Design a protein with these regions (language model features):
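A nucleotide- and high-energy phosphate-metabolite-utilizing enzyme signature
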Residues: 1-309
């Protein structure tokens, strides 16, 4: 029976955030037991990306970051938090949330900094000049604090949104990035699959919707994290037509549902879970809905291309 993947992804994301919080607590205890004491200064554990948006599915890996109140790179505080990040990463991997292929983990210095260094980093991000320089930067705007001094996390996000909104070149880069994905349709508007009969719906389905909603949200000061919430807020502001907004929200639901349905089928057959969907294995109704959803993605691309950013 088909399920609404938005509910499932919200539950999965909530669990990932809860596990990340518990991992941070366990990591603190491990360091204390090893004679390294407790946190030297206030800090927060942050979860960016799909889990922060509430949109993770079954093939999720770990994304997390740390902001601490003060301290220099490689100084005593940073060394303590580096050890904490290593423990958090190892704990999450051990319980089935694998290491992030993109390195978005607090064991890595790029995702573990003092508040002052984070503010400097965000300022550098928004002044970058090439779309390829935005790798993993955009997911920070989906982040949520899950443990510790959450005001530290919220302060960073407030700064990121404020700086991003007022920096036109950054908004333009994000928009170029959002327009870059190929919509998987043939000349005759059928679903276009790869040689294995599958489509990467994360890259060619979710990404244009998520990235487009994100850049419009940043530009217009919408602080909703979930893609449907961003789209609805943009529609409420009159920036996206009510009908178009509804179509995009439904497209997001349909694509998530197709991905979850495929993951459940693959799991039953021992196939590694991924974001790749085989339309030929979906029932006719789901396949038709997926075709409509992919077609609707062009609406988002058009909205960004029209200069709504």
């Amino acid at each position: 029976e088909e399920v609404d993947a938005r509910l499932v992804s919200s539950v999965i994301s909530s669990e990932i955030c809860a596990v990340a919080r518990r991992a941070a607590l366990m990591a603190e205890r491990r360091l204390a037991d090893a004679g390294r004491g407790g946190p030297p200064v206030d800090y927060a554990t942050i979860v960016p990306g799909p889990a922060g948006r509430g949109e993770s599915l079954l093939a999720a890996d770990q994304d997390h970051a740390i902001v601490y109140a003060e301290g220099e790179p490689d100084g005593p505080a940073d060394q303590w938090f580096a050890a904490l990040g290593e423990e958090i990463s190892s704990i999450l991997d051990a319980v089935g949330i694998p290491f992030c292929k993109g390195g978005v983990m607090s064991k890595n210095a790029a995702w573990r900094m003092s508040r002052a260094r984070w503010l400097e980093t965000i300022d550098r991000w928004v002044r970058r000049q090439r779309p390829e320089d935005l790798l993993n930067v955009d997911i920070f705007f989906d982040a949520v604090g899950v443990h510790g001094s959450l005001s530290l996390a919220e302060g960073l996000l407030d700064h990121a949104y404020d700086e991003g909104r007022r920096t036109h070149s950054f908004i333009k880069l994000l928009s170029e990035n959002a327009r870059g994905a190929r919509v998987p349709l043939t000349l005759f508007r059928n679903l276009k699959t790869d040689s294995d009969g599958r489509i990467d719906l994360k890259m060619h389905g979710l990404f244009p919707l998520v990235a487009g909603a994100r850049v419009l949200a940043i530009k217009h000061g919408v602080r909703a994290r979930a893609t449907p919430g961003r789209l609805q807020a943009l529609a409420d502001l009159g920036l996206v037509g009510e009908s178009k907004g509804a179509d995009l929200i439904e497209a997001h639901r349909t694509i998530l549902t197709a991905m979850l349905t495929q993951q459940l089928m693959d799991g039953e057959q021992g196939i590694r879970l991924s974001s790749r969907v085989a339309p030929g294995r979906l029932n006719e109704r789901t396949r038709a809905a997926l075709t409509r959803a992919v077609t609707a993605i062009e609406t988002m691309t058009d909205l960004v291309s029209e200069g709504r950013f």
